[in-house]
Regions:
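Hydrophobic core
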Residues: 13-20
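Short glycine/serine- and small hydrophobic-enriched flexible loop segments
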Residues: 448-456
Length: 538
């Protein structure tokens, strides 16, 4: 669960955090600028071990096209480096010894020991594009072999004042019961979860037995999973509560945070999952750091992979984060007041190809009927729904027309929301005990599970796999007669407040599922007509 539990001073979020840095002693050959913000803070909090001794370092470059980058390959060879590139890709990886990369790009590359003992290499400066490569290369990534990942051990209170949502209450609250009653329970659908931890089959069995659901054993891809910490268990049980007939798969993502090349590993992992499970629904409740640690070139492989996944009919949901809009503060010392450099969004959740899911506090009656919903914020616990404005990505077409006072040109997150407050969350079983789930890492599998039902409905009524769902969600929000979302207008986080329509805390809102399923089918048909082919025709 993306949450950090040390108390923060929400009122201090607009204070400026001054980052002191000593004078540079490195001579630069290409005028590479010093990287500031959270990247500089990460290095400042680490011990500089001197020039890197890494024998296998890398950085990502984006290419002008998908043809073989001959100039780049020749240049790298002349600098004792290599290029890793696959035909058809518009990005490549420059690899070699750290000192060779430092010399070639004219930047220092040092080894660092982080606050938790991890050793990594990094350059405090942004490599610039060598003039000799301008015919092939359009962008150069950062040199950094470590990204702080997000998956804190969830804390499920045993003494909450409410019993939590049962599976039936969850379906009722989000108006999914009409779909279930019509027979849409996930049969023939596949839900894929990407996880850093594992699950205990005894928990899953107890959960299924408690609620008279069919027992289930998820398929595991990518090798043995780490011991359960609560995240994977919550994801699986929440999804099974919604779509008990769906096939559930857990992909072991831990290798992506071991060593360098994180985004290359993520992209290859996504490519493999897309090949194995076409037309599936993906749910991510983990994170790979604040986007201010990277630049657009670094994540180009992941964006390419997700675009290919969309072509296979895959929809992707990711938790926006639990730091109340302060994703760039991350796991750093919460005894210091947050400042502007701490405001930011999660790297993967902010990608335009991903549906980012924020969090709410949900109020229902005794039968689970929706009564009210507010943006989730818990000041004493330093938690809340994350969201904000991307620094890296232009405003996607599907968000054109949305008015946000502090930005007009960039990607906005989250896209949607669901219950995340652990005091109003879903009843689950963890450690053979009843618990209440929470966090946006609960909200993401809720949306993924509900999308399984909607996908099944759309297919059964002449549509296509929902796949790249964001354009459909925004089209449905703009032009449908049936209300498809609960518009969240109260609550807030450390940075923004919700308001009527789209906002940076809860996006378009939480789902009114049966209505939304019909609206998505209508939006898909309208999209198909505009594209010049018949719905259901591919």
């Amino acid at each position: 669960m993306k949450r950090y539990r040390t108390a923060i001073l929400i009122a201090a979020v607009l204070l400026v955090v001054a980052t002191a840095s000593g004078p540079s002693v490195w001579r630069l050959t290409h005028g590479a600028p010093v990287i500031s913000g959270p990247f500089a803070a990460l290095l400042a909090a680490s011990t500089n071990l001197g020039p890197s001794r890494a024998s296998d370092a890398q950085l990502t470059v984006t290419l002008r096209g998908s043809a073989r980058p001959a100039t780049l390959i020749d240049w790298a060879t002349a600098h004792r480096l290599a290029v890793r590139w696959q035909p058809g890709e518009d990005f490549a990886f420059v690899t070699g010894a750290a000192d060779g990369i430092a010399d070639a790009f004219g930047v220092p590359v040092h080894d660092y020991r982080g606050a938790h003992g991890q050793v990594f290499y990094a350059s405090p400066r942004q490599p610039v594009l060598p003039p000799a490569l301008r015919d092939d290369v359009t962008g150069v990534g950062r040199i950094l072999s470590y990204l702080p990942h997000r998956m804190a051990r969830p804390v499920f209170p045993l003494d909450v004042p409410r019993p939590g949502l049962t599976p039936q209450h969850l379906l009722t609250a989000y108006n999914a019961t009409p779909l279930v009653d019509a027979g849409y329970r996930g049969a023939g659908q596949t839900l894929v979860f990407f996880s850093f931890d594992g699950f205990d089959q005894r928990d899953l069995d107890m959960f299924a037995d408690t609620w008279a659901l069919p027992r289930f054993t998820p398929e595991v891809v990518g090798g043995p999973l780490a011991p359960p910490e609560g995240e994977a268990v919550m994801d699986l049980e929440v999804a099974h509560a919604i779509a008990p007939e769906a096939r559930l798969v857990v992909v072991n993502a831990r290798h992506t945070i071991e060593g360098d090349g994180t985004f290359e590993k993520i992209a290859r992992m996504f490519d493999d999952a897309a090949g194995r499970f076409p037309a599936s629904i993906w749910s991510l409740s983990i994170g790979w750091g604040c986007e201010a640690l990277v630049n657009a070139a670094d994540v180009a492989p992941v964006r390419s992979s997700l675009t290919n996944a969309h072509r296979r009919g895959i929809a992707v949901f990711d938790a926006s984060g639990d730091t109340a809009g302060l994703e760039c503060k991350g796991g750093r010392d919460w005894s210091a007041a947050p400042g502007p450099n701490d405001v930011g969004v999660d790297t993967i959740a902010s990608l335009p190809e991903v549906t980012s899911v924020g969090g709410t506090t949900l109020y229902t009656d005794a039968d689970g009927r929706w009564m009210d919903e507010r943006a989730w914020i818990d000041v004493p616990m330093s938690q809340g729904s994350s969201g904000g404005v991307s620094r890296l990505f232009a405003r996607p077409d599907y968000q054109r027309g949305i008015t946000i006072a502090r930005d007009t040109d960039h990607r906005l997150v989250p896209d949607v929301a669901a219950v995340a407050d652990p005091f109003t969350g879903v009843q689950i079983i963890f450690g053979q005990n009843k618990r209440i789930g929470g966090g946006t890492s609960q909200a993401a599998p809720i949306w993924a599970g509900l999308t399984v039902l909607m996908n099944q409905y759309v297919l059964d009524n002449g549509g296509r796999p929902l796949g790249d769902i964001n354009p459909l969600l925004y089209r449905a929000a703009r032009g449908s007669n049936r209300p498809g979302f609960h518009d969240i207008t109260m609550g807030g986080n450390a940075v923004d407040n919700p308001n009527p329509g789209y906002d940076l805390v809860t996006g378009l809102g939480s789902p009114i599922t049966f209505n939304l399923a019909q609206n998505l089918l209508d939006a898909q048909k309208a999209q198909s007509v505009a594209a010049g082919f018949a719905p259901g025709g591919g």
